[in-house]
Amino acid sequence: RYWMHMAHHDNPAHVGIRTKTHKLIYFYGCNYDGGYQTPPGWELYDLATDPHETINLYDDPNHAELVADLKRQLAETRKRVGDDGSHYPAVEKVVQEFWDYDLKDRQKAQMISREFLKRRELELKAGKRNIKTHQGFKEASYPE
């Protein structure tokens, strides 16, 4: 699990699993209190044919069985290592909400994406953005 979220590295929160040939990543995209920051989504890469991870195969019907198997493995691994969501229940709620990534989930993710874009454009236009720290929110300015 990548825990830094958007707070310091501008990298959406995610979990994933990797085999010798494939990598499945779930960008659940919320901060530790469950607030939506980036749109949730899944990515699947064939590391043998696409080592630079440029072609997302998640929606390819030829990989549906592999996606289901890797999701099962990811869920089992999370359980085995104690990543059951109990420490961050708001995050786990978002993780579970978008786990299946059906049409309804995708539509909601698109809405979140539009909201994120609007918020980000306003922040950049103003020359600053909110940076979430462990102490709360603080304003950060960028040099011109």
Stretches with model-predicted labels:
Residues 1-43, 47, 52, 65, ...:
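C-terminal cap/loop subdomain of S1 sulfatases and analogous C-terminal strand-loop tails that border
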Residues 70-74:
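Short amphipathic alpha-helical coiled-coil/interface segments
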Residues 88-91, 133:
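Residues at secondary-structure transition points
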Residues 98-144:
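Intrinsic low-complexity, glycine/proline- and repeat-rich
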